[in-house]
């Protein structure tokens, strides 16, 4: 939901917030998917740093989203700071997506259910992205980008709580 909406709304965000023309804004936001790709590439190293504990890695990625989202709530930031924060959120969510859409379904390979689990998770991911796009469209229209970034932080806080509960349960 978060990553797809960054892709969808950020060109318009830079045009609206910083009066950057559309062509320059499109070039400006090209940085976001590049950093997101680097997040995916960094997954093996980050997973090793978290001692192959996927929930711990996801929790840390969501914490990065919280920090970057809170910075975005300030209206006094430059476009460079905004692009860095959005890129970090995008990269962190790319790591989370790798955990949940690629690694997690592998746990079901022994039962022969990997494809089913992967398909179900993909379905809900795309459905969430579609519903999120619609909701964020209304949210931005009515409340501005502040509400969108606040929701990124809130969703990330909820996700950290869930991940940390999973870690505690797994270690008990």
Question: Which functions belong to the PLM regions below?
Answer:
Residues 12, 98-108:
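Intracellular helix-loop hinge segments at the cytoplasmic ends of transmembrane helices
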């Amino acid at each position: 939901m978060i990553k797809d909406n960054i892709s969808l709304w950020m060109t318009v965000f830079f045009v609206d917030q910083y009066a950057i023309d559309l062509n320059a804004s499109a070039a400006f936001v090209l940085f976001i998917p590049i950093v997101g790709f680097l997040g995916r590439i960094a997954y093996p190293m980050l997973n090793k740093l978290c001692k192959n504990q996927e929930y711990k890695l996801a929790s840390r990625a969501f914490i990065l989203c919280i920090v970057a989202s809170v910075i975005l709530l300030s209206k006094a930031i430059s476009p460079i700071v905004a692009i860095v924060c959005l890129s970090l959120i995008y990269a962190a969510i790319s790591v989370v997506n790798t955990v949940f859409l690629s690694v997690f379904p592998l746990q079901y390979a022994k039962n022969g259910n990997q494809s089913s689990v992967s398909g179900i998770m993909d379905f809900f991911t795309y459905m969430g992205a579609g519903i999120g796009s619609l909701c964020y469209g209304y949210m931005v229209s009515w409340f501005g980008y502040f509400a969108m970034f606040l929701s990124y932080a809130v969703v990330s806080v909820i996700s950290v709580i869930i991940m940390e509960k999973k870690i505690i349960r797994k270690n008990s």
